[in-house]
Every structure is written in structure tokens, then in C-alpha cells.
Amino acid sequence: LFRWLGQKDGQNKVLNLPISNVPGPRERGRVGGALVTEIYSVGPLSMGSGLNITVWSYVDQLNISVLSDGSTLEDPHELTDAMINAFIEIRCAAGLSEELTVVESAMAQ
């Protein structure tokens, strides 16, 4: 469905890459008494646009979601790896360590 929408009517005349930046809560929340450790978000692919980047925060985490149809990116990890490398370059230019903080997921692997 996403691939079909991305190809329908050619290129979108209004936009071709939606990017959303959503600041999240700065303190951990609870749902039914359970501590919320992570929040996941993703934006939709729209007609004529085969790529969506969504960025959001939760407490001390910065999260990035990349959604793509197969004709735009065969492997979305190519884009996310490039983002990580660019982020490391920015950290180094700012005089910070290139080592990124890894947050262990609470979800079962």
C-alpha cells in the first residue's frame, strides 16, 4: 500500500519529505501504575512521498524513525547510519566525545 501511494500521481506537488520533530515529556510517566520507559512514534507516508522522518524525545532520549517505501530506499539503515555518522561529526566539532549513549530497550528482543 505504501509503495503504491508513493508512486501514485508521480511526485507530490506540496511536499516530498515530511519531517516531524515532537518534543516529549521531560519526566517519566505511568500508565495503569506501570512506568513508561520508552515511547515509539512514526509518521505516515503520503501520496507522492516515499520517505518520512519522525524525531521525538522522551525524558533523556532522542529517537528517530525512518519510514520508506522500497522504491525510495531499499535499506532505510543506510539513511539512519548516515545520520549517526553526521551526529558524531557534530559532536566532535563541538569538542565532545564521539561515543554515543546507548539506551537498552525495555522491549523483548
Regions from the PLM with identified roles:
Residues 1-109:
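Acyl-CoA-dependent O-acyltransferases
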